[in-house]
Amino acid sequence: ANAHMQRLCGISHFFEDGYDFHSIIHSPAIVREDKEEYGDWQTNQDLALSICHLLKKQGIRPQVIIEPTCGKGHFILAALQTFDNIEEIYGIEIYKPYLQTLKLDILQHYLDHPQASKSTIHLLHRNFFDFDFQPIKTSFKGKDILVIGNPPWVTNSKLGEIQSNNLPPKSNFKKAKGLEAITGKGNFDIAEYICIQMIKLLSGEQAHLALLLKNSVIKNIVAGQNQEQFPIRRIEQYNIDAKREFGATVAASLLHLTMGDNGAQRCQVNDFYTSTPSHEYGWVNGCFVA
């Protein structure tokens, strides 16, 4: 069954087992009761498509797509509709019902577009925080890579308050001092942690990163560049209307990083809907100006 499904829609291991077959076929509408725990703000399909179209206009033609917390997979579906040379897709998601729904949506996409070229699609039911990317990194060495998505908009301390298991391993990620450094309890946004891990993964690759993040997270990443010197050639921020797109009262944007060797320390801010440049902020003569 899995071999047939892969020929039909590109998904490797469509069914994990017999139980998975029945749960996918008879999957009900998904209503999550733990959205707060997972910082779960799902990207609507129109926004995901608009983001992919923006990237395509900039000449981005990925051969490999990675979505670190893919949720319902709207970015994966949008990428399949937008880019014509995708060879492999990796989607990682902790909430299995979302993956089951995504599998059916991808199947429907290829049933509706039978002439479309098939990508090899790996949908992995895993927690990002204990997922090892190294075994798959060799498969995309030297290829054009796009990391895309909308990682959770929640802090680790908030997850700790509600006793969540969806936490990264304790580490001095934010270079905290004193007791916080010892206990690993320094507060930070989960999305920032995910973004930094993806930047490290993409170092030395031909790659772009496009993530929806809170503006405070983007500012932290730009501010950290003076010390980290990640190999980023260009940093761009496209402001979105989070209230309109997500019903969320928070300042948020699309962060677009072009990987390279320059160690960019300034961010160009644009309006997402018009692509009109607004201003630039970052490091100037050793001072962070925002």
Model-derived segments and spans:
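Gly/Ala-rich phosphate-binding loop of Rossmann-like dinucleotide-binding domains
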Residues: 80
